[in-house]
Amino acid sequence: MKNIIFFDTETTGNTNNDFLCQIAYKNGEETFENLYNPGIKIPPEASAVHHVSNKMVENKEKFSESKDYKKIKELFEDPNTVVVAHNVLFDLMIIEKENIKPKNFICTLRVARDLDKEGKIDRYNLQYLRYLLEIEVNAQAHDALGDVLVLEKLFERLKNKIKENENLDDQQAIEKMIEISSHPSIFKTINFGKHVGKKLEDIAKEDKGYLEWLLNEKLKGEAPDEDWIYTLKHYLNK
C-alpha cells in the first residue's frame, strides 16, 4: 500500500519566479508546518492571501538550509510515497526549485474536475469545494496546515466516489487517481470574462476568436496553466 502524504506550500506569488515561504504536510497522524525565508520579499498581495509577512520570515532559515530539509526530501522522494496537493503542479514546481522531486503525485483538483462529467461545478478551488461538498473540518483557510486538513477530507471524498463509480478497492482507486492526475484535464465551462458561465463547446462555435485570444494569453503567462492550454487546444482542434 502506498504511503499518502498530504501537503501544501505558501509562496511569494503564483509564477515561475516565486519561492516557498511555508510548507505543511500530514503523514498519517504526524502533522508538520514551518516557515522559511524565501530569499526574496513577499509582496503584500501574497501576504493578503496566506497571512505570512516579511517580518515573520526575516530571521528564518532558507528551506534548503534548514534542519527539516533532509527529512522532507527523503519522505517526499520515497518511491512508496504518493504526495497529494490541490493544483499539485504548482506545488511540485515550487518544491522542485528546492531539488525535491516526488515520484508519485495526486492532484485533487484534476480528480474533482474529472468526476464532474457534466461540468456542473462552477469552480474547483479548495475552499469552494470544501463548502460545496460540506466538508466539516476545523481548519483556517489559506493557512498551509489548515489547507492540508481540508485536502485530506476532500481526497477521501473523491476516492470514495471513484470506488463507488467504478467498483474499485482503496488501492485501485488511488492508482486511478494517480492516472487521472498524470495528464491535463479539460474544463467544460468558463467562470471568468465575457462568456462567464458558458460551456466552452458553445463558445467554440459562437466566438472562436475569443478562445484563440485566451490561448495566446495563457501561453504567454508566467504561471503554469497546463490544463487551460490543453483545454483550449482541445476545443480549437489544435
Give each language-model segment a name.
Residues M1-N104, E118-H142:
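Conserved non-catalytic scaffold segment of RNase H-like nuclease domains
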Residues T12, K55, F90-D91, V111, ...:
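General alpha-helical segment detector with a strong preference for membrane-spanning helices
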Residues V82-L89, M93-I94, E98, Y124-T189:
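Acidic, Mg2+-coordinating catalytic module of metal-dependent nucleases/exonucleases
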Residues N104-L115:
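A short, structured active-site edge motif that brings together acidic residues
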Residues R157-K238:
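Acidic two-metal-ion nuclease catalytic site recognized across multiple nuclease folds
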